[in-house]
Amino acid sequence: EQVDELGRCGMSYAVCPWVSSFCGAAAALEAEYTLPGISQSVVITRMEGRTPVPEKESIRSFAAHQSTMVIFLSTGMLRRLSEELIRGGYPADTPAAIVYKATWPEEKVLRCTVADLAETAEAENVTKTALIVVGRVLDGEDERSRLYEPSFTTELRKASADPGKRGRPAREDGVRRTDRRAHSTR
């Protein structure tokens, strides 16, 4: 839309590559959006507001798949979002996160469940400029991509004879990754 308008106005412009805030949110969460046996798909969407969404692309329809969801432009509708996610098929206790101003210096990560999205945002006065991430990939389980599994052969690496412990390696700073379901802010 912006490029079309600039062209109509006769203004010159350059299109620069960028990194979407949904990728920044994954980094903030220290999470992979896809994990074997948990979710191999990511749905990037938004709640219906003043601009309609096709019924087949509604939150409820996408929730039926229980894939990882990244939801834009919906922070002001979190009660309704929770209802739609639950009606669509996510259990109320499904892990969720609100990532406020992903990649900005004032970034804040709020971990919660689908059921308590609104309360979590209200407690931190988050009313806009946030992404909602939903899915079991946020559980903190020790599942990892097969690509990085020592027992998995790739084009660049042979599998090790001793696959070792599954899961993410320990962090050097000593911070434990095990309880990602707890509320947290940064």
Language model features with spans:
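Short glycine-cluster motifs
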Residues: 1-48
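A contiguous loop/helix-start segment that scaffolds small-molecule binding in enzyme catalytic cores
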Residues: 1-5, 9, 39-41, 49-171, ...
